[in-house]
Design a protein with these regions (language model features):
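Alpha-helical transmembrane-bundle signature of multi-pass membrane transport and export proteins
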Residues: 1-420, 429-430, 434-437, 445-448, ...
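Hydrophobic alpha-helical membrane-insertion segments
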Residues: 424-425
């Protein structure tokens, strides 16, 4: 019996050599930079108009909340309509909604309403893109590396975009920055329209889209392995956002101005970018999957050190290490795609993206609320304890061992692999339990961790 060989890592040349993936990748770069810049601009615009910190903060909340409704009620669109039409249509709708925010004199309630409606489009786009990616890059190492590249776009956009947003706001008005975001959506639509191929819908549909979406949600959660993978991919980031939710209170607590929080917020995205490069590019598939548990623990180990109120430089370093633990995403990406039955795959990926954004928003709110009533030296380490428990309880199964790790039995039995491959049926074979494959994972969006987006967080 031939040994099971785990596929090696793919290369950036192989992934970026695919024209359709290049179009998806380029569209994400353009629109994500516009999104992050516009997030800053809309927050500033609302604060300038109202002088209310609560209403300004509601911009961030409204970037997450629609994912619950959009993912649950509109998720079937990714299956019932052609993928390219969904992607281009979502971009054009978002461009129109963000463009309407530029209208002079529009009331704050109108701005927040437009933001909420634009947010409903986001999970539909994310689901269609996530479902399209396995068709563009077949499930395997190339798919995992492609997902990692898209996550890197999101994290890099957060690092670069907030600084770029500050520069643009110095040169333009908040409305000018919002207009730039609307143009970025239009540019993304053009790239996707001419850079991706037309495909038939993955499934037909009769009756209400909302009813179909809810039925798909029940079917996905009825699959035990998929449900476990989804809960892991949602609850780990929801616990890990605690230091970001409390960044401003933390820096003021250690005696620094609140504006220093922006530098603290760069720590986790920087570590996440490095983790995606290392895990998706350098590790073979079997090791990516076996690294999910230890990498998940690495996310929360540095947060326990916040019980000592580390100084600013040390705190940034701890958050970079926390971001490095995000390497668990590479293994989970392949696991979800393999675990989900083919007829539920696109629905599972859409639900994964929507749930990720929604649970992160809930995490921000809950940890921020905890920081109102408990000292920071307890809240952030408390998030570490909760997150560690989630990792241990919901840990997904690891991948199969590579052939080289199994060669010991051949040596002990005196048979080489070549001999075993040509031996008669009576020759000893590996037990089935040693050669089984575990199913595997992989969400969408923009990333495990994505920043809020006034138009769409991808």
């Amino acid at each position: 019996m031939a040994p099971h060989s785990s596929p090696g890592p793919a290369s950036y040349r192989q992934v970026l050599g695919h024209g359709e993936f290049r179009a998806i990748f380029a569209a994400d770069i353009v629109s994500m930079l516009g999104n992050v810049v516009a997030a800053v601009a809309l927050t500033v615009l609302v604060f300038q108009r109202t002088h209310s910190p609560a209403l300004a903060a509601s911009v961030m909340a409204l970037a997450f909340l629609p994912y619950l409704f959009g993912g649950a009620l509109l998720g079937a669109a990714a299956d019932r309509l052609p993928a390219r039409r969904v992607l281009v249509g979502c971009d054009l709708i978002s461009a129109a909604l963000v463009g309407a925010m530029v209208i002079p004199g529009i009331p704050v309630a109108g701005l927040l309403g437009l933001l909420f409606v634009a947010g409903l489009v986001s999970p539909v786009y994310a689901g269609a893109r996530s479902a399209l990616l396995p068709e563009v890059l077949a499930p395997g190492p190339r798919y995992v590396l492609g997902r990692a590249l898209l996550r890197m776009v999101v994290q890099s956009a957060q690092i670069v975009g907030y600084g770029l947003g500050g520069l643009l706001l110095a040169a333009l008005s908040p409305r000018g920055a919002l207009a730039a975001d609307a143009l970025s959506f239009a540019a993304s639509a053009a790239v996707l329209r001419f850079g991706t191929a037309a495909r038939q819908p993955r499934a037909g549909g009769a009756g209400s889209m909302a009813r179909d979406s809810l039925a798909g949600l029940r079917a996905v959660f009825g699959h035990r392995q998929v449900r476990r993978i989804l809960l892991f991919s949602w609850l780990v980031p929801a616990c890990a956002v605690a230091p970001e939710a409390l960044a401003a209170p933390y820096v003021t607590h250690i005696g620094l101005p609140a504006r220093s929080a922006g530098f603290l917020l760069m720590g986790i995205p920087a570590g996440t970018v490095a983790a995606d490069v290392i895990a998706a590019r350098l590790l073979p598939t079997w090791l990516q999957r076996r690294a999910v548990l230890p990498a998940g623990l690495v996310v929360f180990a540095p947060l326990a050190a916040f019980a000592t109120l580390p100084d600013f430089g040390v705190a940034i370093g701890l958050l970079v290490i926390c971001g490095l633990g995000s390497a668990w995403g590479a293994g989970l990406d392949g696991l979800l795609v393999e675990a989900a039955p083919e007829h539920l795959r696109s629905r599972a990926l859409a639900i994964s993206s929507a749930g990720l954004m929604f649970t992160q928003g809930i995490g921000f709110a809950l940890w921020g609320l905890a920081g109102q009533f408990a000292p920071l030296v307890l809240v952030i380490p408390g998030a570490a304890v909760a997150g560690t428990a989630v990792v241990i309880v919901l840990r997904p199964p690891g991948g199969p061992r590579p052939a080289s790790r199994r060669s010991g039995l051949s040596r002990r039995s005196g048979l080489s692999w070549q001999t075993r491959r040509t031996a008669p049926p009576s020759a000893p074979r590996w037990p089935a339990s040693r050669t089984r494959r575990w199913p595997g994972s992989g969400p969408a969006g923009p990333s495990r961790r994505r920043g809020p987006d006034p138009g769409r967080a991808r």
